[in-house]
């Protein structure tokens, strides 16, 4: 765990997304949860050591952001889209995932349920706790339900998976125009610290590089379509323009992810 600012703590070493919390005078606000129950128990203890856990925020609908929310106290906040998506996820599917990736965590799974948000919002909302403002706002593009979390008093923003800092970007469900618009929104914030969905903490200057990766993927697929390649040909022939490796411990092989990205973009632009 890293103490990033006076009241902001971040964990970048658990599977799979980055985690954080703000320790306010009136309690703790947590951002995202680990995938492994064994990690969740440790992370819960870290946060509870700084105060009562009052709120938990899941920044999108992919399981690396919400899978262990069941193990955390506090009022849960997500976007409407994320809550709607999670209503469709059976607890049995999560149990099978845990058996595979965290065998020691199976003992924690008795009574497990996929936790749904207590509060949702459509576009943005502000939470006031102690001396802190927690501003939540929609950040679609990587996923339908993505949201950002901005803490102006700490000059920090959690970007969900709109930013992969020097990790391979997952565009397998992307809407690139929305992704680029979300990056522009992030660039306009007064933030000194950028907490990406994956990778190490960075500054706002990385947003330009992230936008370039999205744009290069789109250009590569549009070029293949213009040449008359079939989707199968595009999947086989397009080399990834992303210079960074896939994060270890995440699903799919790198070739499988490349094909999934090409297929998604081909369907959008063909």
Which positions does each model-derived feature cover?
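Residue-level detector of beta-strand structural context in well-folded domains
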Residues: 18-20, 119, 123-125, 147
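Conserved beta-strand hairpin/beta-sheet module of binuclear metal-dependent hydrolase folds
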Residues: 1-45, 148-160
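Divalent metal-coordination and catalytic microenvironments
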Residues: 7, 22, 32, 47, ...
